[in-house]
Amino acid sequence: MLGGNDPHLLHRAKAEADASVEIDPALGVGHWMCAVVALYQRDFDMSAEKFFEAEALAPNSADLLLQHADALAHFGEAEVAWEKFQQAIDLNPLAPDIYWWAGASIAFKREDYGAAVELCGRMEDDEPALRVLTASHALHGDLAAAREAGSRLQENYPGMTAREISSLSPDRDPVANEKFYQALRLAGIK
């Protein structure tokens, strides 16, 4: 989520999501947005609750399933996340780049770094996925590709350290962020 680490933007997004739920509680999108905001506020239990409410209201929304899958991976439930990602792809086989980015992130959490690289390769523009691409190349053992992607990543995050970049991911388990940090270090990011 763009601005996912900006408390002011998260506060505004939460207010709008809450208003959406108040206007029409039977519409899944408000619950969905509440879930996304809660994820980036690191309120994992609320995020999980809101994603389940949203999915109950809109069970055939491929975009919702995708975001729920991504959130499940951040919660530490990578295998369940992968199944939900597959459901989203089944509903939207001509998926846009964000699907492949989310799938790569989930594959990374499953420690399937080759699949993560392959999913990034399906993107028309891999720039949004440079964090996961860099880390996946590093942990897959292709340090030359990791350093190349890492150079591009540093252009997008000028002046940020590997620790700061890795902390952008809202993971429940600190071990996940530490693994990501170590991968970025392998790619040559300080």
Task: Label each PLM-derived region with a short phrase.
Residues E22, A26:
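Short alpha-helical segment in the cytosolic histidine-kinase catalytic core
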Residues R42:
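Charged DNA-binding/catalytic regions of mobile-element recombinases
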Residues G4-V21, M46-F51, E55, A62-K190:
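Alpha-helical protein-protein interaction modules
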